Curated annotation (Swiss-Prot):
The keyword Cytoplasm applies. GO terms for biological process: regulation of translational initiation. One of its GO terms (molecular function) is translation activator activity. Belongs to the MIF4GD family. It comes from Xenopus laevis. Coiled coil: none annotated. PANTHER family: EIF4G DOMAIN PROTEIN, MIF4G DOMAIN-CONTAINING PROTEIN. Residues 7-206 form the MIF4G domain. Keywords: Cytoplasm, Nucleus, Translation regulation. This is MIF4G domain-containing protein A.
Amino acid sequence: MADSEEQEDYKMQAFDADIQNLLKTALKEPGNVDLEKAANVIADQSLRDTTFSREAGRMCYTIIQAESKQTGRTMFRSSLLNRLQVEYKNRKETRARSLQEWVCYVGFMCNVFDYLRVNNMPMLALVHPVYDCLFDLVQPESLKREEEVDCLVLQLHRVGEQLEKMNCQRMDDLFSQLRDSFLLQGGLSSLTQLLLLEMIEYRAAGWRMTDAAQNYYYSEVSD
């Protein structure tokens, strides 16, 4: 338990003392704090900090579990989903304004999708928004930007298998577009081509990477 608390504390170091106290209380005694504020604080930081955006889902899951157990309510989850919906509607403007904020948002939403469960199933409300963001990332202009390609690959590794189980047709469509880009789009860097091929083979192998494939792709990336 101490190790887990230290990990959570580490993720909070970017916050001032008041916000740290808010989040620590939300994690342990969610009925005693403003959970809408806590959700917005986590979202705000996730849009600024790539590392935090990748880990925030775990914090959100912990707060949701604690709130359900202690109060039987879903205030934090509702506030979090409302904020994600607002950011989803504004995603085109976000991408135009700040590429880093955009990839942080995608990472945050995929991380929340990865962690949050209702009746042991991923949240249906997030399936199409996550897919829409991944489709944004396979557009020709996005595939010319290293940050967006890295984000695409990371999120497909993280949630691709879960997403496919929730809606196989959209995953087929996504990979059809991804394959067309790999084969037909000019101007892609050799690293992007390598990463796209890796994703195509990764899905074809049942969302698993063989040792041989891992050694090949990642020795190429490191070179």
